[in-house]
Amino acid sequence: MDMYIRCDCQLKKTRCLQYAYYCNDFPFDILNKDIVKSGKHKIYQKHPMTFDIETSKIPTDNEGHYEAFMYIWQICIEGNVVFGRRWEELQQFMNNVIKAYKLSEGERVVVYVHNLSFEFQFIQDFFEFTDVFAMESRSILTAKTPHLEFRCSYKLSNMSLAKFIENTPNTQHYKGVDDLDYSTVRTPDTPLTEVELGYCFNDVKGLYECIMELLKDDNIASIPLTSTGYVRRDCRKAMNKNKNNRKIFLRSKLTLLQYKLLRECFRGGNTASNRYLTNLVVKNVGSYDISSSYPFQMIARDFPLGKWNYGVIRNIATLEEYNSKYCTIARYTFRNIKLRENKPIPYIPQAKCLKLGCDREIYNGRILHADYLTISLTNIDFDIVKEQYVYDEIAVEEFHYSRKGPLPKELRDTIMYYFEKKSRLKGDSEHYYEYMKSKNKLNSIYGMTVTNILNTEIEYKHGEYIKKQMTEEEMKEALDKYYKNHRSFLNYSWGVFVTAYARRELEDALNVVGLDAIYCDTDSVKYIGDHDRDFEAYNERLNRECHKKKVVNYIEVKGNLLYMGIFDKEHGYDEFITLGAKKYAFLQKGKLSITVSGLSKNKGAEELGKKGGIRRFQRNEVFYNSGRTISQYNSASVHEITVDGCTFSTASNLAIVDTTYTLGISDTMLDIIERVQGKKNYEEKNQQQKKN
């Protein structure tokens, strides 16, 4: 084989030939040892590697089961791309790298892999891993051998590889498009074209360029492991400027009971559809969304500050007084609770109910009525429940309250810094990278506040992922450890109240449009009718409130004021239909689009168009070219298989298999829709059931 392999690569604006090494021909003497340290125990070779594999799959039976295998691997090391076709070659190559760098005990080379969770399923049996850090079962952040440390660059960037390369300056090797047909079965002996090799080349070279760009502001020992690590570091630095912030943090220390209660109270965004307008194609639909919703709540609202105290609630008057004066959390039990008729979007999710009676009606996972239910709520959530529902009795247990006030100024200033930077750079093509960096940091600030302090440890052992359940004593020790750690600075309750305030503001928007609401999702509401003046009035009122509290929720850019927290009008829709949460299609300026959780937007819209358009967005409609896949995990020790006459080693693997997607509405949900919309067939069906 020639020393160099020709690769036809996709560059930023053109294609060109690039040259790679085959692993057996790589000149290891060109590698330079250069060690960087972080503390006593983190010692790394300065130059990281990037690694990727390409795989094929074959059926193992007639029931849709597959196994996958690697047919080529590629590495970029110190800017050089290297190919190999078999696992034994990879093992030998890595051993040679370790020898070339003359790594001593405790010294490691970092190997970045974009979506390490996929590659790890293949490599786990070919290396002796001493430490695997899994964020969830089969979700790998790092995996270490004595001299290698595999890291996930997807979790570092929070972007697809294509977007990571596209959004990073000084990158030349772009992610290939349609240069490699994944449906073709290839083996380690299958010849690859220069274009196919170029696709493989770019995957590791482009990623290497991204990592090296990031390392201009860091070194391999200091660079964060995740995207939120950057903003956590910035915010910690800002908060440490004021020693009083540490005192507030320690005074806010949670007991285990209080932490569990806050975990019960935590919810994400409110995503749901109006049962009166679900499963209907609606014309001339408007849309508003909240500008930078979560960051706005953090600069404008009052949050728990200081100790949480236990309170006894004996009557409604006491409850109302505490809920108005403090931030509160508690477990609420309601008897004979029922949604008011004029409320289009039910607020209480079944999934958050701690107890739920048998006599109940549930629409798309939301409570319409129940003979009783128990749920943990903040005072913000309780106010929304009180507006939406009527009930016969209420009981309040485990009531806790904390004094409230603005978040520390240093944290609010950091949020405004990112908002200003993002706003000033928006639309500036020359500074797109800085814009995306500021935007991602702005959006990440909320995320770091809701990191689970008592995250369950996932133990990886011989290919198995075991969730280690913490005892009560271990949980208490973990909480104590968190508050004693001088790097800790965030109050978990802040994140819980961020989302509660955001849901409150979304509820305000739903109140603005009333029964004209069609759909809402976290920070946006879609509706029929003309409500522009209503939203203008709401925005004016909100800005007056901010001015009164001396909250500056805007910046000036080129003579224009850009606000956080107000409702901005979006492009409307010619036609719109929803079948429930995370499930809708629309026509916008004549273009058909689709948003369905688990369904490819592009492929879904294309197939829906071929089926006949938006009116085929119906219950039981099957999408065959959905872009949806299922993951089939196969565990096996190292063994040989023969495919198309080629015998090679393989082991555990992961087959990604295409599957169909069927639009669904449950029978119960459909019954509710037909009843409230007064459809004829509902009455006929009801009468028939009575006869039977």
Predicted regions and their residues:
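Conserved acidic
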Residues: P48-T50, P59, H65-H114, F120-N692
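N-terminal accessory regions of nucleic-acid-interacting proteins
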Residues: M1-M49, I53
